[in-house]
Amino acid sequence: MAFILGENSGGSYTVSDYVDEPELIVDEIVSIVQDAAIENVFYSDDGETTASAIIFKQRVSPFLSESPHEVAEFEEIPTADIRVGDDKVEKAFKIAEGLRVSYEMIKDNRIDLLSRGVEQLANEFLYASARQGLDRVKAATDEHSQVVSATTPWSTVTAEIGQDVLRACAMVSSALVDGDVDDERKAALGYTPDTIVMHPSVWYNIIGNKTIQAAFIGANSGDNPYFKGFQPYKPWGLDVAVSQYVDPKQVFVLQAKKPGGKKFLDRPQVTPLYSPYGDSSIGGATMEYRADIMERSIRALYDPKAVARIQVG
């Protein structure tokens, strides 16, 4: 659906209105980007920080170095060490973009151009955010061999999509600790995959797949996602998250918000419209106004094995 400026604020404004009431454009941009970042599926919100870099340790085990001991009366209770990985460092990253509104756009009331500009600015911001988050996840799945190759490309209607997804689920749920353990039953990291992330085009390949459709013949036909769409259908018991910013050749299976965390030096901020080169009735020396969006944040992958990637094509 196309974005139409003014819909979210319940009014129909001219370009001049946005210049006269500079805060209006802030609400419009925030309405698009708020809670829309696909990386939020992979990263928990770890709050604010003032540091430009963080040192962290990846999770290597859900257990201490030793099991509890049976102790005799008056015997000292033994202690065990916390198992941690090597130190890793992630630095802050700033993304920012600005949108210009010309004097001519104001005088000619080119609300269509302003609508496109606001939508494109928000999309650029979301894309940059997604790339920062997803590129790290992809690199981690390669590093830790958390990759499943599809038996057959998913664009093929006879592809064994379900088997590929279940292999990825098994990979996440059976991910093992690094190093030795005192009990093999403690070797699993204990993740529970609950979410599948994909490009919208991949979803349509799924609901058109012959094997998937066969499951809805007869009594289950009323629940067929072919007709009902995404919700409330949960394939393989997984929540479905789709985004145009995910590579169409990749699908991610994960425990939501478990792989990593994101700390903010500055949460996403949008400026009201302002004239950058001197305020005047015509927009300063360059006869323009602008609005900016920026964010400074740090992303860290604490549990890289909580996600698996399926190469679907």
Predicted regions and their residues:
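Sequence/fold signature of self-assembling virion shell proteins
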Residues: 2-9, 209-313
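Short, surface-exposed beta-edge/turn micro-motifs
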Residues: 26-28, 192-194, 249-250
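A contiguous, surface-oriented mixed alpha/beta subdomain in the mid-to-C-terminal portion of proteins
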Residues: 174-236
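Residues forming anionic-ligand binding surfaces in small-molecule and nucleic-acid pockets
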Residues: 92-104
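Alpha-helix/helix-capping structural signal
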Residues: 104, 201-202, 246
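Alpha-helical scaffold segments that mediate packing/assembly in large oligomeric complexes
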Residues: 103-181
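N-terminal alpha-helical "arm" segments
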Residues: 1-38
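Assembly/oligomerization interface modules of large self-assembling protein complexes
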Residues: 25-95
